[in-house]
């Protein structure tokens, strides 16, 4: 599930151009069940040669929790593969995971909840002390409505709110935070043309149910993908967030979430299309709406290797991930960062979707694996 996105425009694009140009953003697939294998640990010290200077990292004023966002496929794995994935996350040093909790999967038949997949995964994360962010979304076919022209209509708010409340009550001791929908600013995930007003109405229906089921729940809104404003297809994070703040009272959420993909650029870059750079604009919108207290959670960040037109080199992937952690650490307004992803979704080097992992599909380590392990080891030593 869930969506990683690419650089929007060519280098040198102006702000005005960035807001007008069509987006070419498609989320990576998340339904592949990886095969088991044994990890290797090949890497070099050059893996992080292009990251932020070490002196900047040492001067950081706070520690940012790091997790993985592995997509829904982790729930479809064998128990052996699931355990190996979680053990490898802990070996790297991450303490958090973003898990998909799909309404369509849980309530595939109307009125009948099947929690077996999520029960199994959450039992394993709990045994390892991994803290869970659950992203809830994905409407079942039986709940999807269409207009007279056959166009999909917005999410069934009442049905989704019931599901969210049931999930929060069931997992109140196992899930620490709840993210409402995944990349609702893209038609690909919203299904109907994306619309901030419709999303805000969903948040206002769901948040009280989450808090009723789990009074200690932390609620995240946004989950925004890199995008530009393209009518009927995508809404830029800035436009989308303004629409959310105009309609959602602050009591209904605790943090904003975004997916600040920057590849092929570094997260420290100043390109106008760079979503890591655009977070500054999101922060300004939050402050303008009296919400300087809230953090921005980075619930997906990564870069694909392989041979596709959008791929980066394996050493560059390592540098981008480490630099992303350091840059998040340097800013005073970020919450946890979740890396997409632990393991490649497939084996086609030419398919961008298959190559976001720090491990290959058969569990051989890319340079990013050891680079992250070193970085997080230093982080623990500083704390």
Predicted regions and their residues:
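Short, acidic/polar
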Residues: 76-90, 159-167, 234-246, 318-325
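Substrate-binding cleft and catalytic face of glycoside hydrolase catalytic domains
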Residues: 89-233, 263, 348
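Boundary/entry segment of secreted carbohydrate-active catalytic domains
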Residues: 52-95, 100
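Aromatic-rich peripheral "rim/lid" segments of glycoside hydrolase catalytic domains that contact
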Residues: 114, 133, 170, 179, ...
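Noncatalytic carbohydrate-binding groove/subsite architecture in carbohydrate-active enzymes
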Residues: 61, 79, 161, 195-316, ...
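Hydrophobic faces of well-ordered beta-strands that scaffold small-molecule active sites
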Residues: 64-70, 97-99, 132-136, 178-180, ...
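C-terminal region of N-terminal signal peptides and the immediate post-cleavage residues
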Residues: 8-38, 44-66, 166
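N-terminal export and membrane-targeting signals
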Residues: 1-3
């Amino acid at each position: 599930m869930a969506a990683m996105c690419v650089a929007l425009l060519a280098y040198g694009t102006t702000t005005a151009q960035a807001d007008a140009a069509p987006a070419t953003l498609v989320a990576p697939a998340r339904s592949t069940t990886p095969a088991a294998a044994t990890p290797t640990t090949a890497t070099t010290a050059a893996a992080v040669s292009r990251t932020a200077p070490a002196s900047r990292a040492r001067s950081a004023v706070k520690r940012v929790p790091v997790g993985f966002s592995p997509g829904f496929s982790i729930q479809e794995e064998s128990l052996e593969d699931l355990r190996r994935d979680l053990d490898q996350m802990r070996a790297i040093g991450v303490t958090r995971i973003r898990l998909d909790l799909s309404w369509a999967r849980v309530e595939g038949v109307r009125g009948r909840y099947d929690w077996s997949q999520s029960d199994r995964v959450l039992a394993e994360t709990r045994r390892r002390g991994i803290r869970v962010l659950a992203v809830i979304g994905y409407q079942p076919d039986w709940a999807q409505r269409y207009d007279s022209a056959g166009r999909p209509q917005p999410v069934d708010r009442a049905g989704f709110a019931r599901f969210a409340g049931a999930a929060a009550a069931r997992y109140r001791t196992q899930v620490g935070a709840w993210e409402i929908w995944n990349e609702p600013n893209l038609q690909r995930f919203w299904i109907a043309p994306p619309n901030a007003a419709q999303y805000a109405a969903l948040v206002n229906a769901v948040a009280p149910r989450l808090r009723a089921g789990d009074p200690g729940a932390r609620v995240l809104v946004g989950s925004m993908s890199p995008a530009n404003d393209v009518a009927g297809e995508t809404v830029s994070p800035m436009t989308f967030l303004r629409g959310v703040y105009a309609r959602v009272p602050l009591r209904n959420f605790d943090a904003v979430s975004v997916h600040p993909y920057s590849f092929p650029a570094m997260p420290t870059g100043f390109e106008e299309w760079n979503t890591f750079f655009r977070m500054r604009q999101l922060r300004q919108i939050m402050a303008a709406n009296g919400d300087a207290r809230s953090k921005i959670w980075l619930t997906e960040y990564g870069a694909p290797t392989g041979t596709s037109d959008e791929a980066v080199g394996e050493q560059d992937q390592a540098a981008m991930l480490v630099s992303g952690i350091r840059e998040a650490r340097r800013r005073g307004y970020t919450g946890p960062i979740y890396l997409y992803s632990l393991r490649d979704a497939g084996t086609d080097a030419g398919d961008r979707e298959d190559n976001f992992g720090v491990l290959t599909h058969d569990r051989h380590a890319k340079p990013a694996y050891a680079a992250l392990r070193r970085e997080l080891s230093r982080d623990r030593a500083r704390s």
